[in-house]
């Protein structure tokens, strides 16, 4: 069946699947299920309440919350009312959230709890267009922020008056209508509001559906933030389109335990997650056996996205009998462009273009894409839109090549390309992936643009360093230990020995603490913010070139 919009899709699936479980989530420490009927009723109530509150088609509604069932219900409710969801990552500071919501012109805002409500109150004067705030947690409700439960009840009570209008709005919504504005977290510069239509998101969910196994009852354990397009499409909308059970991990920290309890068939993650799980397994005598056990007895599908997956990680999983595959996409493409399938894959590749997507490589190596999932443009930024949407193609900003079998290989970001003072060009991600292949290296970022050699900021795997060198002391103490510096220099030299001379890291800064989204040095999808890291370590890096 072809669907005109996401609201119609959800209502149809909820009616078709009825008592079957749609969501599984923890309540007071125990997992409980929400049926498709309950899910559909809640979405309808949310949409009704928004209409009764005066929300018009095309109005923007903000969503500032952690992953939880209410996030999905609010998302679908906003769109069922014909409005546009503007999600903010839960960890975003109040001032940053205010900038995004003000730019989008949000008129209503959903928040999850007291902490998020405090952010909203802190910047409320900067958001005069906000007419109301709804808080999911009943305990955090206040006169200026009514509780979610009461909001839904008002929606149910109003259905006698709003039902016909909801049906009219659903009928009027087309694939060209705006569904969401998703602000890119951005590794550099200010975030841009990516305008995705109902057609963009529906087409991508349909395209991904072709890869879903037909012989298994899918249980997908979701943990990546829904404010990021990877989880929003590949977990949320994919589960609605395919009609399978979406289980919620309690948190990223509890994910290993949640896997054992839920016993999922599918998990999606970013490279950092797969690396950490592999590192944990390698602490035991039989890593492949331990790694298999860590993902439960029912696992059928592990998909990596959000950033390039180092080939060594993929090989280790496949050697353990785990079907880890890599895909590629961007927020601007809703997001999936390519997928490795279980039947057709290349370890080093990001896979083949999904049905309906065309790819080509520009003369300078940039990957270009077109298809029904490519965004409408950037909100209020026509010049930025014109720069990336040209002659019917979306210019991804990524570099790569396509082999004779149609597999895409990502080699780096165009803007990250390092040009040394001798004119030699280096793709930093390639060097970084080699460094990360050493178990003693936790994180690494390479620099050297317009310099005469490469340098890096390296975060060691301190547990492994302590074990190998039989050392004690804090991370900060070890970072200053000459024995550690000498050891790591030998490791780096050995790792890069087979690379070209200009691709070798001559000197580096040893950093005791990891890069994180909280430190402002990674995006929410765990991509390095190179400029932020360089700024923080500018003095140390400059000294390396002065020595």
Give the location of each predicted region.
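Conserved AMP-binding/adenylation subdomain of ANL enzymes
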Residues: 202-222, 226-290, 298
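Structural core segment of the AMP-binding/adenylate-forming
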Residues: 52-53, 80-154, 487
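Conserved ATP-binding/catalytic segment of the ANL
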Residues: 353-420, 425
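Conserved pre-ATP/AMP-binding loop-to-beta segment of ANL
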Residues: 19-21, 135, 153-183, 190, ...
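Conserved AMP-binding A3 loop
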Residues: 33-37, 179-205
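Conserved AMP-binding/adenylate-forming core of the ANL superfamily
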Residues: 23-72, 76, 93-98, 147-156, ...
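Gly/Ser/Thr-rich phosphate-binding loop
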Residues: 265-269, 277-345, 358, 442
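Conserved C-terminal "lid"/linker of ANL adenylate-forming enzymes
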Residues: 443-446, 490-547
């Amino acid at each position: 069946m072809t669907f005109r919009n996401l609201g119609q899709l959800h209502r149809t699936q909820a009616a078709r699947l009825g008592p079957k479980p749609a969501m599984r989530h923890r309540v007071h420490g125990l997992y409980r299920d929400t049926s498709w009927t309950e899910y559909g009723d809640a979405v309808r109530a949310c949409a009704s309440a928004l209409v009764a509150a005066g929300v018009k088609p095309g109005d923007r509604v903000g969503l500032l919350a952690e992953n939880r069932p209410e996030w999905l219900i609010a998302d679908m409710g906003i769109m069922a009312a014909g409005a546009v969801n503007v999600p903010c990552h839960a960890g975003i500071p109040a001032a940053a959230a205010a900038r995004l919501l003000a730019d989008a012109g949000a008129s209503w805002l959903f928040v999850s709890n007291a902490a998020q409500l405090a952010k909203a109150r802190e910047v409320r004067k900067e958001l005069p267009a906000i007419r109301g705030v709804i808080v999911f947690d009943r305990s955090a409700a206040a006169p200026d922020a009514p509780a979610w439960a009461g909001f839904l009840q008002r929606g149910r009570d109003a259905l006698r008056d709003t039902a016909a209008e909801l049906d009219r709005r659903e009928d009027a919504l087309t694939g060209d209508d705006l569904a969401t504005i998703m602000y890119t977290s951005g590794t550099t510069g200010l975030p841009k509001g990516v305008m995705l239509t109902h057609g963009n998101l529906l087409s991508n969910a349909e395209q991904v559906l072709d890869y879903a196994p037909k012989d298994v009852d899918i249980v997908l354990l979701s943990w990546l933030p829904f404010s990021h397009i990877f989880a929003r499409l590949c977990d949320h909308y994919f589960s609605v389109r395919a009609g399978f059970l979406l289980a919620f991990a309690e948190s990223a920290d509890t994910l290993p335990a949640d896997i054992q309890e839920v016993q999922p068939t599918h998990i999606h993650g970013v490279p950092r997650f797969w690396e950490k799980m592999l590192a944990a397994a390698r602490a035991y005598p039989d890593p492949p056996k331990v790694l298999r056990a860590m993902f439960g007895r029912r696992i059928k599908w592990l998909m990596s996205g959000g950033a390039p997956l180092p080939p060594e990680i993929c090989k280790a999983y496949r050697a353990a009998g785990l079907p880890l595959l890599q895909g590629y996409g961007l927020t601007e493409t809703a997001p999936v462009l390519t997928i490795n399938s279980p039947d057709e894959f290349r370890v080093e590749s990001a896979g083949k273009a999904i049905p309906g997507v065309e790819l080509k490589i520009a003369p300078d190596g940039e990957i270009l894409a077109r298809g029904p999932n490519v965004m409408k443009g950037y909100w209020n930024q026509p010049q930025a839109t014109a720069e990336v949407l040209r002659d019917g193609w979306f210019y991804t900003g990524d570099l790569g090549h396509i082999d004779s079998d149609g597999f895409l290989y990502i080699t780096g970001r165009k803007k990250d390309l390092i040009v040394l003072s001798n004119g030699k060009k280096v793709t930093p991600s390639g060097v970084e992936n080699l460094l990360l292949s050493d178990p003693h290296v936790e994180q690494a970022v390479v620099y050297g643009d317009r310099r005469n050699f490469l340098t890096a900021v390296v975060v060691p795997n301190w547990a492994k360093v302590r074990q190998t060198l039989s050392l004690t002391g804090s991370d900060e103490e070890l970072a200053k230990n000459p024995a550690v510096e000498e050891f790591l220099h030998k490791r780096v030299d050995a790792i890069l020995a087979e690379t070209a001379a200009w691709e070798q890291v001559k000197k580096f800064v040893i950093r005791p603490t990891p890069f994180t989204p909280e430190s402002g040095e990674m995006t929410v999808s765990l991509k390095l913010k190179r400029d932020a890291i360089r700024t923080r370590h500018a003095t140390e890096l400059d000294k390396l070139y002065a020595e």
